[in-house]
From Swiss-Prot:
The lineage of its organism: Bacteria, Pseudomonadati, Pseudomonadota, Gammaproteobacteria, Enterobacterales. Substrate binds at R71, S72, G73, N84, L88, I89, D90, M98. This is Deoxyuridine 5'-triphosphate nucleotidohydrolase. GO terms for molecular function: dUTP diphosphatase activity; magnesium ion binding. Homotrimer. Its EC number is 3.6.1.23. Keywords: Hydrolase, Magnesium, Metal-binding, Nucleotide metabolism. It is an enzyme of class 3 (hydrolase). Pathway: Pyrimidine metabolism; dUMP biosynthesis; dUMP from dCTP (dUTP route): step 2/2. InterPro entries: dUTPase, dUTPase-like, dUTPase-like_sf, dUTPase_trimeric. Belongs to the dUTPase family. It catalyses: dUTP + H2O = dUMP + diphosphate + H(+). The keyword Magnesium applies. Its cofactor is Mg(2+).
């Protein structure tokens, strides 16, 4: 299913020097987001920084949200993940997409201008209304939590 999402280019290099976000393959779930930087940024181990994308989106449809996720290769090979682990973009947000980048690795990492640094997916949203109750209907699991079902 394809859905039209309004995008505003905030940095004139986007669409020229830096490509617009695209799906890498026909089966890709995530759009690659690029670091819209003037100069390379070096991240020491344990450091975080906010990286601009040069883009703003307006989803408008309250039944959708966007999520920013780390790119698997950067996380696995270099320890580069999102500082907030997952970025959530609400349907009514219209500001620049910023990527919180965290170097959880052992070595410094340099983010280059235009580098693909995160990915964004669109997900359905259900807004819940709480129904106050005294007790829940009984289930087999009950209050069994962490480790409840074992490892095997």
């Amino acid at each position: 299913m394809m859905k039209k999402i309004d995008v505003k280019i905030l940095d004139p290099r986007v669409g020229k020097e830096f490509p617009l976000p695209t799906y890498a393959t026909s089966g890709s779930a995530g759009l690659d987001l690029r670091a819209c930087l003037d100069d390379a940024v070096e991240l020491a181990p344990g450091d975080t920084t906010l990286v601009p994308t040069g883009l703003a989106i307006h989803i408008a449809d309250p039944s959708l949200a966007a999520m920013m996720l780390p790119r698997s290769g950067l996380g696995h090979k270099h320890g580069i993940v999102l500082g907030n682990l997952v970025g959530l973009i609400d349907s009514d947000y219209q500001g620049q997409l910023m990527i919180s980048v965290w170097n959880r690795g052992q070595d410094s990492f340099t983010i280059q201008p235009g580098e693909r640094i995160a990915q964004m997916i669109f997900v359905p949203v259900v807004q819940a209304e709480f129904n106050l109750v005294e007790d829940f209907d009984a289930t087999d699991r009950g209050e069994g939590g962490f480790g409840h079902s074992g490892r095997q």
